[in-house]
């Protein structure tokens, strides 16, 4: 948008606005997908261990968090190894 268009009050066409927004979204997604795993995974794992430990005695090694991307599908897998129940 030029200065003259701005001063005269001419508006951008909706198609060009939509195209610019799509380019921004695509650039954002591409930059985020280049990284292997999200930054929040270690914190998520620690918090899960803390919450589960309130109810069941587990070690940090008993919980595994795995994040995987395939094409446009993202999978967050959480595996928890629970201790065997003892008879009372």
Curated annotation (Swiss-Prot):
UniProt keyword Transit peptide present: no
Top-level taxonomic group: Bacteria
GO process terms (BP): cell division; regulation of division septum assembly
Gene3D superfamilies attached to this UniProt entry: Cell division topological specificity factor MinE
Keywords (A to Z) from UniProt: Cell cycle, Cell division
Disulfide linkage: none
Similarity comment: Belongs to the MinE family.
Function, in words: Prevents the cell division inhibition by proteins MinC and MinD at internal division sites while permitting inhibition at polar sites. This ensures cell division at the proper site by restricting the formation of a division septum at the midpoint of the long axis of the cell.
HAMAP family xref list: MinE
NCBIfam families per record: minE, PRK00296.1, PRK13989.1
Name recorded for this polypeptide: Cell division topological specificity factor
